[in-house]
């Protein structure tokens, strides 16, 4: 009887100790974090697998062959031989600085010690380093977009040859307007089927007459080459005209 009383007198808290509230909250949070991390890992792994298989399928043709990656395009720049044909000079050697005072690529004004390259097709000057970098990816003038591609220039020359005829030059000993003088003669230049030629950069025209007889006193045709800016400006002021080649000029001298 006494033993039964002693067992009943033991408090229930001693057999089943109570768990505090903070511990319960911490355990619940850890459990939720583990569940969330597991679902997130599964979702991320599935996404990566789908991305990998999609990329692999896109690289294969319906016949099972791999699609080869396209090779990068070839160099689309101007031929170095054409670039070297444009004259290079020091800006200090230019007596007439009327071809431009700044580089259109770097927008810096030319100084006397700068090395300038002149595009003789359209007469636009640039720093040599700037225009050389430009020509690595382009075939046109940065200012006027004049086509400098050798194929285009060649086709233009070929067309010009088809549009011209042979010039016949003959000596004559008399003239209806002026009597002949001793030691002098005149030449009759006959030309036909000549067309207009125009500079696409400046818009200037050079009109060639059709079925015209041109008379001149002892005129002769000269060609030459120049490599300095002074020669370019002197020839330009004296009436020299550019023929197709960028390194040669020609004129009709009286």
From Swiss-Prot:
It is a single-pass membrane protein. Pfam families: zf-RING_2. A zinc finger (RING-type) spans 103-145. Its EC number is 2.3.2.27. SMART domains: RING. Keywords: Membrane, Metal-binding, Transferase, Transmembrane, Transmembrane helix, Ubl conjugation pathway, Zinc, Zinc-finger. It is found in: Membrane. The chain crosses the membrane at residues 25-45. It catalyses: S-ubiquitinyl-[E2 ubiquitin-conjugating enzyme]-L-cysteine + [acceptor protein]-L-lysine = [E2 ubiquitin-conjugating enzyme]-L-cysteine + N(6)-ubiquitinyl-[acceptor protein]-L-lysine. Gene3D superfamilies: Zinc/RING finger domain, C3HC4 (zinc finger). It comes from the Eukaryota. One of its GO terms (cellular component) is membrane. GO terms for biological process: protein ubiquitination. InterPro entries: RING-H2_zinc_finger (IPR053238), Znf_RING (IPR001841), Znf_RING/FYVE/PHD (IPR013083). One of its GO terms (molecular function) is transferase activity. CDD domains: RING-H2_PA-TM-RING. Pathway: Protein modification; protein ubiquitination. Its main location: membrane. Belongs to the RING-type zinc finger family. ATL subfamily. The RING-type zinc finger domain mediates binding to an E2 ubiquitin-conjugating enzyme. This is RING-H2 finger protein ATL28. It comes from Arabidopsis thaliana. The lineage of its organism: Eukaryota, Viridiplantae, Streptophyta, Embryophyta, Tracheophyta.
């Amino acid at each position: 009887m006494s033993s039964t009383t002693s067992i009943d007198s033991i408090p229930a808290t001693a057999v089943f100790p109570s768990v505090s509230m903070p511990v319960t909250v911490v355990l619940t949070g850890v459990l939720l974090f583990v569940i969330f991390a597991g679902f997130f890992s599964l979702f991320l792994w599935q996404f990566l697998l789908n991305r990998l298989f999609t990329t692999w399928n896109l690289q294969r043709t319906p016949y099972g062959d791999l699609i080869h990656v396209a090779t990068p395009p070839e160099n689309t720049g101007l031929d170095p031989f054409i670039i070297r044909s444009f004259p290079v000079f020091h800006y200090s050697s230019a007596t007439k600085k009327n071809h431009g005072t700044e580089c259109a690529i770097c927008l810096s004004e030319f100084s006397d010690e700068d090395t300038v390259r002149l595009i003789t097709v359209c007469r636009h000057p640039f720093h040599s380093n700037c225009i050389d970098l430009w020509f690595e990816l382009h075939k046109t003038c940065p200012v006027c977009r004049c086509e400098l591609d050798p194929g285009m220039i060649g086709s233009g020359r070929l067309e010009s040859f088809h549009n011209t005829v042979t010039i016949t030059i003959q000596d004559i000993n008399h003239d209806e307007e002026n009597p002949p003088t001793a030691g002098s003669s005149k030449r009759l230049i006959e030309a036909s089927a000549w067309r207009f030629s125009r500079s696409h950069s400046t818009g200037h025209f050079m009109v060639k007459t059709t079925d015209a007889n041109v008379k001149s006193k002892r005129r002769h045709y000269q060609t030459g080459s120049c490599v300095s800016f002074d020669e370019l400006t002197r020839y330009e002021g004296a009436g020299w005209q550019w023929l197709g080649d960028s390194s040669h000029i020609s004129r009709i001298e009286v």
